[in-house]
Amino acid sequence: MLEESSEPGWLSEEVKTGTTIIAIEFDGGVVLGSDSRVSAGETVVNRVMNKLSLLHDKIYCALSGSAADAQTIAEMVNYQLDVHSIEVGEDPQVRSAATLVKNISYKYKEELSAHLIVAGWDKRGGGQVYVTLNGLLSRQPFAVGGSGSAYVYGFVDAEYRKAMSKEDCQQFVVNTLSLAMSRDGSSGGVAYLVTIDEKGAEEKCILGNELPTFYDQ
């Protein structure tokens, strides 16, 4: 008699974004980028998840950690920013969005496993990038996160330059993601980019076979 088959192990694993995420400021805006692989244990459960989540018209966040936790935080902040913008009659500031993410992350630090990079543009501060890890709130010229970040810290430190143009920042993000995706087993799929400036947000998806390649020399 055949024994009843047990459910696959990945069904009981927490779904995590794995992830490489990055954001960088340029004069007049920001560029965010992420890979698209989502894993549960050793199983890839989604190859094309967009980890760049809209918080408001000109504010996005990049998600890493538990997929459910990160998406929940993003949805909570999106709702609160919508209410806030209606109450004050103007678009929210990027720092306000980052502060909301920081407060939620810290309040539920024992229950949640997520790291969000918040970036966007507002008329008071221009392009801004904020790190919100474990209740920290820090503005940085650029930030990287996720499991793939360990493979690219040397690259970004060597390649980053002050006062980079929008096009240079876009290429910097693409190169960083491509390198991380080729090294980190938890990062992969396609690369998502969002460029935000005074005019609004422009989203772009770059297929895996269109990414630059990095080979060991």
Swiss-Prot record:
Q: Enumerate the catalysed reactions.
A: Cleavage of peptide bonds with very broad specificity
Coarsely, its chief localization is cytoplasm
Any idea which GO molecular function terms this record carries?
threonine-type endopeptidase activity
Q: Which CDD domains match?
A: proteasome_beta_type_6
Post-translational modification note: Autocleaved. The resulting N-terminal Thr residue of the mature subunit is responsible for the nucleophile proteolytic activity.
Q: Which residues form the propeptide?
A: 1-18
The residues annotated as the active site are T19 (nucleophile)
Q: State the compartments where it is located.
A: Cytoplasm; Nucleus
- Show the GO cellular component annotation of the record: cytoplasm; nucleus; proteasome core complex, beta-subunit complex
Chain positions of site Cleavage = G18, T19
Among the record's GO biological process terms, what is one? proteolysis involved in protein catabolic process
Q: Does the keyword Iron-sulfur apply?
A: no
Quaternary structure, from the entry: The 26S proteasome consists of a 20S proteasome core and two 19S regulatory subunits. The 20S proteasome core is composed of 28 subunits that are arranged in four stacked rings, resulting in a barrel-shaped structure. The two end rings are each formed by seven alpha subunits, and the two central rings are each formed by seven beta subunits. The catalytic chamber with the active sites is on the inside of the barrel. Component of the immunoproteasome, where it displaces the equivalent housekeeping subunit PSMB6.
Give a short account of what the protein does: The proteasome is a multicatalytic proteinase complex which is characterized by its ability to cleave peptides with Arg, Phe, Tyr, Leu, and Glu adjacent to the leaving group at neutral or slightly basic pH. The proteasome has an ATP-dependent proteolytic activity. This subunit is involved in antigen processing to generate class I binding peptides.
Q: What is this protein called?
A: Proteasome subunit beta type-9
